[in-house]
Amino acid sequence: MSNEAFLKQMRKPGDMNDFVNIVEWFASKRGCTSIKLSALCYYAYVWGLVFYNKEIAPFVFYKTEDGPVDKRISKIFGVSDKIITMGMKPKLSEELEKLLSLIWEKYSNYDGYYLMERAKVHYPFSEAQDVLLPKDMFLFYSWASMA
């Protein structure tokens, strides 16, 4: 089954569409690998918590040796530095499009390994047992700069 077909199969009403749309939005960007995709989704999620005080989609990030990973993303795309190729960008709300564009602008020049290593030294990852807690992410990144 192709990545596009699997994502289409996952579509559900409400917030799950935002999960799929966010994954598709980043995956449609030129030069995006699965590792970078996971990292960008992580940063979009945490900055969404900070800027909008809500979850932008039902991501669940696990502590793995690679960094914070939503297992659904790694199931679809694997964990590699192979470039992902996907079709057109999905249509998003203006608020979500603005956030994802900001994340892309800030982090797209870095490779996925660098972004994951960076996340691994931050409190929410270093203190997690298994699942990174949204509360820990919000508290840490509320005090961190986007730099």
Q: Residue spans of the language-model regions?
A:
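Domain-edge interaction signal
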Residues: 1-147
